[in-house]
A protein has these predicted regions:
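Residue-level signature of the cytosolic catalytic core of signaling kinases
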Residues: 58, 200-204, 272, 322
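NAD(P)-dependent short-chain dehydrogenase/reductase
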Residues: 138, 164-252, 282-284
Length: 344
């Protein structure tokens, strides 16, 4: 059996592909249009796992191309599950370009589910987000009300509903993983080679990556968007998760889906909140470098606090966090940025 990953030339998808290649026997088919992904990630996976990765450059809206591929694939090596990472992910951009988010995220998920039903692909792992919850000042569990305050969160919430409704009427089951804030780089990287995995995102919007870019001199300054939120220091609080732990959460969710054949939703986080100011100061401390930080206006659509209640995934799957430490996350992100300086 094979696994099909969408968007796995990107940050989270590539790390998850590595985890599956390392810990399962399945071959992996990666579909990505390279609009935000990187061939370097495919090269790294192919280098360490030769003859186990197939890459197809395609957009998920190219349904005829994907349909033709699946017609052939299902005859020779049927797909056990789809892991769907392909999506737009910027809260700020979604406020400006909402229709792009509903098209790219929601509509493409709908078309992918239709292909699953047509080709008898019965299992689906979906990358969702804590942003579906909206504003909150407490630890969020999977039963917390959904109230997204931006089109990004709304597009993911609607995608979740498509999957869950389909699972009620078809031989089709899904695991939905609601990510909190992901950071860090692969803990298995060999930085003497170019065959590495990490966040290559251009013009990144992720706090830890931006702060680490400042620390290694790639940026002259950074901004904190809002310092008057109702939090302990006025800046937003987030639950930061190491990308390798998130990858392993996908593996645990997949294994549980195979075992129980039941659709489930899981938060993936550490149930620990760190403020923006705390993260920036920690990056300065670990890197031993100071850099300019400006206080800017709030970004529209940013919740004040998002912290995961992770009890469900810990109690009901094999998932066990390995890198549940802000220092560890930041150190791996700094190592990655220094590596990029050497190999770019």
């Amino acid at each position: 059996m094979a696994l099909l990953f969408t968007g796995a030339c990107g940050y989270i998808g590539s790390h998850t592909a590595r985890a599956f290649l390392e810990k399962t026997k399945e071959n992996i088919i990666i579909v990505d249009d390279l609009s935000t992904g990187f061939l370097e990630h495919i090269k790294a996976l192919e280098h360490y796992y030769p003859n186990r990765v197939v890459f197809i450059q395609a957009n998920l809206n190219e349904t005829q191309k994907l349909d033709a591929f699946l017609n052939k694939q299902q005859l020779k090596d049927p797909i056990e599950a789809i892991l769907h990472f392909g999506a737009k992910i910027s809260v700020e951009e979604s406020m400006r370009l909402p229709l792009e988010y509903y098209t790219n995220n929601t509509l493409n998920t709908l078309e992918l589910v239709k292909l699953c039903l047509k080709h008898a692909i019965k299992r689906f792992i979906f990358s969702s987000t804590a942003v579906v919850y909206g504003e909150s000042d407490f630890s969020l569990n999977e039963e917390s009300p959904l109230n997204p305050i931006n089109p990004y969160g709304a597009s993911k919430m609607m995608s979740e509903r498509i999957l869950l409704d389909t699972s009620k009427i078809a031989d089709f089951k899904c695991v939905i993983l609601r990510y909190f804030n992901v950071a860090g780089a692969c803990m298995h990287n060999d930085y003497t080679t170019p065959y590495t995995l990490g966040q290559r995102t251009l013009n990144a919007t992720h706090l830890i990556k931006i702060a680490c870019e400042c620390a290694v001199g790639k940026r002259k300054k950074m901004g904190i968007f809002g310092a008057n939120y109702p939090t302990r220091d006025g800046t937003c609080i987030r639950d930061y998760t190491h990308v390798d732990d998130l990858a392993n959460a996908h593996l645990a969710g997949y294994q549980t889906l195979l075992e129980k054949n039941k659709s489930e939703i899981y938060n993936v986080g550490y149930n620990q909140g760190h403020s923006v100011k705390e993260v920036v100061e920690k990056v300065k401390e670990i890197s031993n470098n100071d850099f300019l930080v400006e206080i800017l206006d709030k970004r529209q659509g940013d919740p004040a606090s998002l912290i995961a209640n992770n009890a469900k995934i810990l109690q009901n799957t094999p998932f066990k966090p390995l890198y549940n430490n802000l220092d560890t996350i930041i150190k791996s992100a700094l190592d990655w940025e220094e590596h990029l300086l050497r190999f770019q």
